[in-house]
Amino acid sequence: MSPLLPEGARVSRVIRLNGIGLRYGRGSEVLHDVTFHLRPGSFHFLTGPSGSGKTSLLRLLFMSIQPTRGGIHVLGQDIARVTPSKRAQLRRRIGIVFQDFRLLEHMTTWENVAMPLRVSGKRISDYKEDVTDLLQWVGLGDRMHSAPSILSGGEKQRAAIARAVINKPELLLADEPTGNVDPQMARRLLRLFVELNRLGTSVLIATHDHQLMRQTKAPRLELHDGHVRIV
């Protein structure tokens, strides 16, 4: 088994899927023969009708589930061959925003956003100002010491996005990241994603928001009937 590539190692493809099929239980396949490659530093939208498999595809890329068939490489690693401990290391290089947000209720909003930095071993004095500044930028300056349970859906979404980007991940995966915010905040969050991409993060955003997609010239991965094509 090849060792895990070190953080920062150059790879020719940040994401590589070959002939991916996915089914849940004995049902029909959700994804069929999905094949595509994305280069490091790329920015793509993932679009398609509800139920087309966008969330399932992001879960595959974050290694939350395994494909029924086919191969997946993320950040240069064959995810079928990495050990559980190395899978955890690989996930720390990925920022993820799911639709259910997954904020930890026993932590404040500030602590939730700071968690990736704390887990990576950084000292609080090195990131305290960065976390505070980011929370203010996404409009949560007055909520940073609040528990997630009292946040609105849009506020939880912004906190989850801040947590996903605070550590400047190599890859950002976001599932409908602007679904609970107003158009003005959606544009602000898009600027955040674009700036993160400019600094080197590869970005893949699943969205139905055509107005949001029209604001950039980023290519789209379109899912339809379990198949994907780049448009």
Predicted regions and their residues:
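Helix-to-loop junction immediately C-terminal to a conserved catalytic motif
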Residues: 62
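Conserved ABC transporter NBD signature motif
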Residues: 70-78
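ABC ATPase NBD coupling module
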Residues: 79-95, 196-198
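Short coil-to-helix segment of the ABC ATPase nucleotide-binding domain corresponding to the Q-loop/switch region
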Residues: 107-115
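Conserved ABC ATPase signature
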Residues: 147-151, 155
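A short, proline-enriched helix->beta-strand linker immediately N-terminal to the Walker B motif
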Residues: 166-170
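Catalytic Walker B motif of ABC-type/P-loop ATPase nucleotide-binding domains
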Residues: 172-175
